[in-house]
Amino acid sequence: MEKWWFNSMLSKEELGHRCGLSKSMDSLDPIDNINSNENMILNFTEKSIHSWSNGSSYSNLDLLFIIGDIPNLISDETFLIRDRKGETYSVYFDIENKIVEIDNYHSFSNYWNSSYGTGSKSNDTHYDLYMYDTKSSLNNHINGCIDSYLHSQMRLDNYVLRDSDHYGDNYIFDDIKTTTKTNGRDKNLEVTKKYRNLWIQCENCYELNYKKLLKSKMRICDECGYHLKMSSSERIELSIDPGTWEPMDEDMVSTDPIEFHSQEEPYKDRINSYQKETGLTDAVQTGIGQLNGIPVAIGVMDFQFMGGSMGSVVGEKITRLAEYATNQNLPLIIVCASGGARMQEGSLSLMQMAKISSALFDYQSNKKLFYVSILTSPTTGGVTASFGMLGDIIISEPSAYIAFAGKRVIEETLNTTVPEGSQEAEYLFDKGLFDPIVPRNPLKGVLSELFRLHAFFPLNQNSIGQ
């Protein structure tokens, strides 16, 4: 663990908005961190740090809390807090596991209640802290503060305060410094690797997005609006009304039909490892549910499972879904995210293209039902050459990578240069390859309107059984 100290100074309005405090921060002294390599008997000497109550003026101060520091700060660390009465408290944070432990908790609780219980309360009752009389509620509040702070600060890289005589009333200044007895750069790298599962880097602008908040934003990058990859479960949750999802053929698994030989890892072992990693049996989830009350049959491919490759199980599940939708007169949605046919199953994977296309022919041409294909990044290979491009309406996500063969394969095979961006959704849209480009935010509403236009209306009851 590293030794941290920082001087945190917030205005009453700013702090009250972020963490629900109704008092200024001059009641708390600078916060220190216990280094695990140091003597645990600490000397709390006064530090010559300007307090907020000094009324000191600051000009052109850089906000040093940059995005790269956040993964280091939110590791499992122990901080020492000293109040204005001289009492000290040891607070241990494990943000990843949501653990907050307070040493000398009784004194800390008394100070907390005396400081914030009898004083003036904020105008917004949601932020009053006089109610916090249990460790559980305090833990929840602290975790809520951290989430709120990260949410509001994560897009800030370097912020320079404007020239003003009243910085104390309007701005936040966090000066975070690290001192360590080991190599600081190596230590930071170690901490970053340890907690990188808390952050997701945008593939387009390379900014970090806080994983916990990213899901609520439909996995759309805060900085550039790029649509990051989603799991099949997240897409189902995004599109299907809560409590209406009924999965189909969940127990269907591949049996290594051609006994594919691999020197690195047997096919069955690879399947098993992806099943454990994703919780899925194969690269597609199929089922029925309601979309804004409208009964639908939906299949969602998952790129996290062997690159969304299409084998015999994927082909069979989608075929059965199309046949079920045909028999029940349901609209059909297939969300594509695939690298193409699965080479470990040879020609059996290729024949899935014809099998699915045959089922869709009966669904569309004979039954005159409505099939919507949604292309996400990436959609390539055998999926593009079959059911991905057979929709009555073909929708693409923004900036999706859509192709039959990859850029490298084309260039090596044809000995020609593939123009940059020629396999992206916007370029292909101009060429008429599909219909609309729809972002994730309005997608559910767009699908609902399309279904209504084709005479599919919501049910009054919750069940979609016929």
Curated annotation (Swiss-Prot):
Domain CoA carboxyltransferase N-terminal, chain residue ranges per copy: 198-466
UniProt remark on cofactor binding: Binds 1 zinc ion per subunit.
Gene Ontology terms for molecular function: acetyl-CoA carboxylase activity; ATP binding; carboxyl- or carbamoyltransferase activity; zinc ion binding
GO biological process: fatty acid biosynthetic process; malonyl-CoA biosynthetic process
One Gene Ontology term, aspect cellular component: acetyl-CoA carboxylase complex
UniProt keyword list: ATP-binding, Chloroplast, Fatty acid biosynthesis, Fatty acid metabolism, Lipid biosynthesis, Lipid metabolism, Metal-binding, Nucleotide-binding, Plastid, Transferase, Zinc, Zinc-finger
InterPro entries to which the protein is assigned, alphabetical: AcCoA_carboxyl_beta, Acetyl_CoA_COase_Trfase_b_su, ClpP/crotonase-like_dom_sf, COA_CT_N
Lineage: superkingdom: Eukaryota
Pathway assigned to this chain's UniProt record: Lipid metabolism; malonyl-CoA biosynthesis; malonyl-CoA from acetyl-CoA: step 1/1
Subunit structure of this chain's protein: Acetyl-CoA carboxylase is a heterohexamer composed of biotin carboxyl carrier protein, biotin carboxylase and 2 subunits each of ACCase subunit alpha and ACCase plastid-coded subunit beta (accD).
Matches recorded under HAMAP family: AcetylCoA_CT_beta (MF_01395)
Family: Belongs to the AccD/PCCB family.
Protein name according to UniProt: Acetyl-coenzyme A carboxylase carboxyl transferase subunit beta, chloroplastic
Organism: Fagopyrum esculentum subsp. ancestrale (Wild buckwheat)
Gene designation: accD
